[in-house]
Curated annotation (Swiss-Prot):
Domain Peptidase S6 positions: 54-304
Active site residues of this protein: H124, D153, S260
Database matches in InterPro entries: Autotransporte_beta (IPR005546), Autotransporte_beta_dom_sf (IPR036709), Autotransporter_pectin_lyase_C (IPR012332), OM_autotransptr_brl_dom (IPR006315), Pectin_lyase_fold/virulence (IPR011050), Peptidase_S6_dom (IPR030396)
Organism ancestry: Bacteria, Pseudomonadati, Pseudomonadota, Gammaproteobacteria, Enterobacterales
Domain writeup: The signal peptide, cleaved at the inner membrane, guides the autotransporter protein to the periplasmic space. Then, insertion of the C-terminal translocator domain in the outer membrane forms a hydrophilic pore for the translocation of the passenger domain to the bacterial cell surface, with subsequent cleavage.
PROSITE patterns linked to this entry: AUTOTRANSPORTER (PS51208), PEPTIDASE_S6 (PS51691)
Enzyme class at the top of the EC tree: hydrolase
Function field: Serine protease with enterotoxic and cytotoxic activity. Internalization into the host cell is required for the induction of cytopathic effects. However, the serine activity is not necessary for secretion and internalization into the host cell.
Species this chain originates from: Escherichia coli O44:H18 (strain 042 / EAEC)
Record keywords: Cell outer membrane, Hydrolase, Membrane, Periplasm, Plasmid, Protease, Secreted, Serine protease, Signal, Transmembrane, Transmembrane beta strand, Virulence, Zymogen
Protein name: Serine protease pet autotransporter
GO molecular function, one term: serine-type peptidase activity
Signal peptide, first to last residue: 1-52
Listed GO CC annotations: cell outer membrane; cell surface; extracellular region; periplasmic space
Any one Gene Ontology BP term: proteolysis
């Protein structure tokens, strides 16, 4: 029977001895004998023994002890600074160490895996075979086939298979150090400069909870942990030294019968890891006086047993042939060895090379072990269809084994080690894999695959490499591992993953893998997805109960959902349970006490008080529990069609959504749990189960991205945080924001429906990485409805919002940002134009009689009658807007305003109105009114009420100010008066005065025709000048010119001018006459502080050039040009105008080329250009004032005089002519007159004459006999308008 020894003082030996369970007052345990009713595991009790609770649940909950041992709840491996809430509401903090990984403990806790096929326990467990002879890890049962023990109660065991579920406990604890060194290395600071060694024990002995007996021993569900501190490193006992510890006084879990052999762990500060100190031996004392004794790990004995199972085979890159019980390498042959128990050993291969099997090989309890960083091939000799069977395959780090034989079909292949197993042919058996990589290189490589432990990877290297069935023959147990699709597509009905230790990935960066999950009923995938993957859930017909519920991390290229619901949520943290079965229907006299009910009852009162019934309900998780693990979902695009998307609690989602005929619910209150989570894999590891429950569970959820939706609906629930940071469009898709939700749109949002909000809605511009904020536009055709008291509607930071707002509740509205909130903000020029210089612009009506509005640096364009309870305006503008003769009224109970403007429209009888019912206060506010013109002979003044406020309101609230309207300065004449018990501001008339600056801006715009004419003039005679330099014949030519110019008032322009043409030479008596035709295209841009725009011009002309033998010449040209103009003005409300115009040109130039030498010359010249420029006229209204701006047709006459000098340089096959010129260009006629007309009368601005000095340098080159190339640079100075820089290049081909 399994003993937990009690340690007593012996007078005979003079020391402590281990006393058996049969002695008086010693706690003990055995198997209850098989009765006729049933076989059960029980505890032998003695009436004269007092049993203390092994788990004290007066302070901590029962579940906490189980969570720790099973790495559930907060006790995830590696977690630090862990604390739990005690029943009195205080926190209990565990040592500031990472939580150990207890996966190396066997399910019943009586033994501990140390890796490979080895486990440790205590020697006296041999008397109870149910304790450690059979060990379960995950879904695999292992059997002890050999062991070695010591007199100090230590036992090292050899198991029948390599353990795949764990890499085993670290056994590097050095007990041979002196005590102080051990304390220094493994101790924890406890204050006052002292260190203590603190550790954990994991076991499932005879379990009780504060007097609640379970009658259970070796029950996996009841695996629990103890927290202790070591009190004696070398307690002298029978058989040798033991380590003595005492349990923590708060988190108290005493050692009991059945805990013999359970692992004890301490932390190695030097290596930063947990190590196995030893195995539990026995106890002395009871309750708070209990001391537990630990047998230290014995590395010497462990190595001795391992050596019994090692046969080294050094292949050294040769071939090892195995057959007939022998191994042959070259000329050397050795027998396959067995140990003294006639058990096969592990064949430990080294050196790399080939292994050839001549026949089936059954190593029994021995396996294949391969060393690190080598390449091996295992194959059959010839074409033999041979198989291998054994304890498993262990491949060292960096090594790859090409496996080209089969494993025995009546057994499961166990694979461990960090190296890779490349399976080349189908195995027709099952695989259990833990560490390293298994590459599947054949169709249906294994019937089923069991993936355990976490670090392992299964990689696809062939089509249909997995098995068949709903789960494709692959099962991921606790901590799972990776499935690498490696560029292959894979379809599942369900993925058999028990927790988030499972990841499906694609390491192939060039070929995307499609992962299809086609569950026909509700299903939760607990694992993760990452890599180059597209995730699909497509059904042929719409099914509302075929939800794909994702509660692991998802990072995919895209997700596509059709005809089925998709749920993204966090995961309710898994916890330990007290019994796998939900109820115990067996009578107590046969099956023992129903401890689950007793625990629930014992903790009921504190659970009712703390609302923590979920802690005692024997469920893996509960919808009401507060601890949920947040999951991240990342994708580029999520496409859903005829489907629904739910983003529930603890989901953090980023990506763009495209939805058609679908429902989107962000912050869905419905969540899903799986009562078998963490326990989904059953049997031998190749079956899967789920028990899905749903209900209300509200927690924070997040979505960041954009939504493009058509014919659907979007609901955003409580505690949802939504950030729309890319453009979103909702077409026939209603958006509802519920109370408690927080939605921020930082990019444009357009909807053809309405937006209902009971939560917080914020519309804002987008902040770029440079710190600059770019504007965003928001348009809701159906408007915005605020449905809850306290609902917040905020627009700020370059938001331009359009859509009516209404609310019957006490909502809060805010437009704009105070200067202190955006002092670091940089605004783009586009934003300043779009927002009229304000931080925020809103256009629409507000009907919210119970709501308040705060405006800071904001513009409100009031488009309909509006009503508010309170309006607070600072540095803002309320601009009444609407159709012709449709006026609006803004009614508020209280108005507080400062440094703001209210701009109204009126006719001779009506006007927009501001009505303040209860209180109007503030100062330094402008009251502005659009201009109106009185018609006929009505000489009476106006009498139009604009503002009505409570009686005796200060007259200083509003003041008037001169506005520039049209080309005039307009001052409305407004008086305040007490009328009908109210303070009223009344418009009585206007005062208008011409504004010279506005007229100057208009004149600058209208002068564009003259500057365009001048640009064409400067390019008019270029071709004829070239003819004199090239001594050419008939030919075709092309020219491109680019230049910039500037004038006063901030005017600047630039142009690109292209000419093409052809001409012919006529040799006459005493002269050469060239005649030709030209086509031109000009693209010019011009602007100033007041306007900007462009002109595109096309033209055609004829020219002639007569060059006399004497050196005299005459050039003539005629040309027509058509102009298409588009200009945008920022003055007088002109806006953008498109118009066409044209011009005619007639030019003549005379000169004389005087040759100083044969290659140098001087050329005086004179030019006269006459033309016609068409006029234009614009008529419009600016703030109610009629405006006209016109310039008439005019005929410019421009003269130019100057002198050019040049010199030719030539060689055998080339000639270059360089030239420079200086001239003066001047207007003989003033350019056109501009006529401006507005309410202050007509203004005529006469055109002025201008003149400028011209300078140019250039050259022409003969590249070949019939090819010429020219280049020229120009600029002008001393004019009102000057060419800053110009360059032209020409090319001619002579026939």
């Amino acid at each position: 029977m399994n003993k937990i020894y009690s340690i007593k003082y012996s007078a005979a030996t003079g020391g402590l001895i281990a006393v058996s369970e049969l002695a008086k007052k010693v706690i003990c345990k055995t198997n209850r004998k098989i009765s006729a009713a049933l076989l059960s595991l029980a505890v032998i009790s003695y009436t004269n023994i007092i049993y203390a609770a092994n788990m004290d649940i007066s302070k901590a909950w029962a579940r906490d002890y189980l969570d720790l041992a099973q790495n559930k709840g907060v006790f995830q491996p590696g977690s630090t600074h862990v604390k739990i809430k005690l029943k009195d509401g205080t926190d209990f903090s565990f040592p500031a160490l990472p939580v150990p990984d207890f996966s190396s403990a066997t399910a019943n806790g009586a033994a501990t895996s140390i890796g490979g096929a080895y486990a440790v326990t205590v020697a006296h467990n041999a008397k109870n075979k149910s304790s450690a002879n059979y060990q379960t890890y995950g879904s695999t049962q292992y059997t002890q086939i050999n062991r070695m023990t010591t007199g100090n109660d230590f036992s090292i065991q050899r198991l029948n298979k390599y353990v795949v579920e764990t890499r085993g406990a670290d056994t590097s604890f050095n007990y041979n150090e002196n005590n102080q060194n051990i304390i220094d290395r493994y101790g924890v600071d406890v204050g006052n400069g002292k260190k203590e060694i603190i550790g954990f024990r994991v076991g499932s002995g005879n379990t009780t909870f504060s007097g609640i007996k379970t009658s259970q021993t070796y029950q996996a569900d009841l695996l629990s942990a103890s927290l202790f501190h070591i009190t004696n490193l070398r307690a002298n006992t029978v058989g040798g030294n033991k380590v003595e510890y005492e349990n923590d006084s708060y988190f108290t879990n005493l050692t009991t019968n059945g805990d013999s052999g359970s692992g004890v762990y301490v932390f190695d500060n030097k290596e930063d890891k947990w190590v196995l100190l030893g195995t539990t031996h026995g106890i002395i004392g009871n309750g708070k006086t209990q001391k537990t004794y630990v047998t230290p790990f014995d590395s010497k004995t462990t190595n001795e047993l391992k050596q019994l199972f090692i046969q080294n085979v050094n292949i050294d890159n040769n071939t090892a042939t195995i057959g007939g019980g022998k191994i042959t390498i070259g000329n050397t042959t050795q027998d396959i060895e067995k140990n003294k128990n006639n058990q096969n050993k592990d064949l430990v291969f080294s050196g790399g090379g080939k292994i050839s099997l001549k026949e089936n090989l059954d190593l029994g309890y021995g396996g294949f072990i391969f060393d690190e960083n080598k390449k091996y091939t295992v194959s059959a000799e010839g074409n033999n269809n041979v198989t291998f069977k054994g304890a498993g395959i262990d491949i060292g780090k960096g090594s790859t084994v090409d496996w080209n034989i089969k494993y025995a079909s009546n057994d499961a292949l166990h694979k461990i080690g960090e190296g890779s197993l490349n399976v080349i042919q189908a195995q027709n058996t099952n695989l259990k894999t833990g560490n390293g990589t298994v590459i599947l290189g054949a169709q249906k490589t294994f019937n089923n695959i069991y993936v355990a432990g976490g670090p392992g990877t299964v990689q696809l290297n062939a089509e249909n490499a997995l098995g068949e069935g709903d789960y494709a023959g692959i099962f991921f147990t606790e901590n799972g591992g990776k499935l690498d699709l490696n560029g292959h597509n894979q379809t599942f009905k369900k993925i058999a993953a028990t927790d988030s230790g499972t990841t499906i990935t694609n390491s192939n960066t060039t070929k995307e893998s499609v992962l299809s999950v086609n569950n026909q009923n509700n299903y939760i995938y607990h694992g993760n997805v990452d890599g180059n993957v597209r995730l699909e859930h497509h059904l042929d017909t719409k099914q509302d109960n075929a939800r794909l519920i994702l509660d692991g991390d998802i990072q995919a290229n895209s997700i596509s959902i059709k005809n089925a619901p998709l749920v993204m949520q966090g995961h309710a943290t898994d916890h330990a349970i007290f019994r796998t079965t939900k109820t115990n229907n067996c009578p107590e006299f046969l099956c023992g006490v129903d401890w689950v009910t007793r625990i629930k009852n014992a903790e009921n009162s504190v659970n009712q008080k703390n609302k923590t019934t979920y802690k005692s309900n024997n469920q893996v998780s509960d919808l009401s529990q507060p601890d949920w693990e947040t999951r991240k979902f990342r994708f580029d695009n999520l496409n859903i069609e005829d489907s629904s998307l739910s983003i529930a609690r603890n989901a953090d989602v980023e990506g763009n959504i495209q939805a058609k005929n679908s429902v989107i619910n962000i912050g869905d209150k419905t969540a899903y749990i799986d009562l078998y989570s963490g326990k989904n894999i059953t049997g031998a590891g190749f079956t899967f189960r789920q028990d899905i429950k749903s209900g209300d569970s509200i927690g924070e959820s997040k979505f960041t991205g954009g939504i493009m939706a058509t014919d659907g609906s979007i609901s955003i629930g409580d505690k949802a945080i939504v950030t729309l940071n890319t453009v979103s469009s909702l077409d026939r898709t209603a958006l509802t924001i519920h109370k408690g939700a927080n939605v921020t749109a930082s990019s444009s949002l357009f909807t053809t429906s309405n937006i209902k909000s009971g939560g917080d809605l914020t519309l804002t511009g987008a902040t770029e990485s440079t710190g600059e904020i770019t504007p965003s536009m928001f348009y809701a055709a159906g408007g915005y409805e605020l449905t809850e008291d306290g609902a917040n509607f905020t627009a700020k930071n370059q938001a331009s919002v359009t859509g009516d707002i209404k609310s019957e509740k006490a909502a809060k509205l805010s437009f704009g940002s105070a200067d202190k909130d955006n002092s670091a903000t940089r605004y783009s020029q586009f934003a300043l134009a779009m927002l009229d210089g304000f931080d925020t612009s809103y256009q629409g009506s507000i009907k919210a009689a119970q709501s308040s509005l705060a405006m800071n640096n904001a513009l409100w364009k009031v488009t309909g009658n509006s009503e508010l309870k309170k309006l607070n305006s600072t540095g803002s503008m309320v601009l009444f807007n609407g159709g012709k003769n449709i006026f609006n009224t803004l009614t508020v109970d209280e108005l507080t305003t400062s440094n703001s403007a209210f701009v109204m429209r009126t006719n001779t009888q009506q006007a927009d109105q501001l009505i303040v019912k209860n209180k109007l206060e503030g100062a330094n506010n402008l009251l502005l009114v659009d201009f109106i013109e009185k018609k006929g002979n009505d000489k009476n003044g106006l009498n139009i009420d604009l503002v009505k406020a409570p009686e005796n309101t200060s007259k200083d609230v509003f003041k008037t100010e001169t506005q520039t309207i049209g080309f005039s300065d307009v001052t409305p004449e407004i008086k305040q008066q007490e009328k009908d018990g109210k303070s009223v501001w009344t418009l009585t008339g206007y005062k208008t005065v011409a504004n010279a600056d506005a007229a100057k801006k208009a004149t600058s715009l209208m002068s564009g025709g003259y500057k365009a004419f001048l640009a064409e003039v400067n390019n008019l005679n270029k071709r004829m000048g070239d003819l004199r330099d090239i001594n050419g014949e008939a030919g075709a030519w092309a020219r491109i010119m680019s230049g910039t110019g500037s004038a006063g008032g901030g005017f600047s322009d630039n142009y690109t001018h292209v000419q093409v043409g052809a001409d012919n030479k006529h040799e006459l008596d005493g002269l050469d006459l060239f005649t030709g035709v030209t086509m031109t295209y000009t693209d010019s841009h011009a602007g100033s502080d007041a306007f900007s725009g462009e002109t595109k011009s096309v033209g055609a002309g004829l020219y002639a050039s007569a060059m006399f033998e004497s050196g005299a010449y005459i050039d003539l040209i005629g040309k027509y040009v058509h102009h298409d103009n588009e200009y945008t003005a920022t003055f007088a409300g002109l806006g953008t105008r498109d118009y066409s115009s044209h011009s005619w040109y007639a030019g003549a130039e005379v000169g004389y080329r005087y040759h100083v030498t044969d290659s140098a010359w001087i050329e005086p010249q004179a030019e006269l250009v006459y033309g016609a420029v068409s006029g234009k006229q614009f008529s419009w209204k600016d703030q109610g004032m009629n405006l006209t701006m016109k310039d008439k047709d005019f005929n410019p006459l421009i003269g130019r005089t100057g002198v050019d000098v040049g010199k030719s340089f030539s060689g055998k096959d080339w000639k270059v002519t360089a030239r420079a010129g200086l001239g003066y260009q001047f207007d003989l006629f003033a350019n056109g007159e501009t006529v401006l007309r507005d309410a202050s009368g007509e203004k005529r601005i006469k055109g002025e004459k201008d003149g400028r000095m011209l300078m140019n340098v250039g050259l022409n080159a003969e590249i070949r006999d019939n090819v010429r190339f020219g280049l020229e640079f120009e600029k002008s100075a001393f004019g009102k308008y000057n060419v800053d820089n110009a360059i032209n290049a020409n090319f001619r081909y002579s026939f």
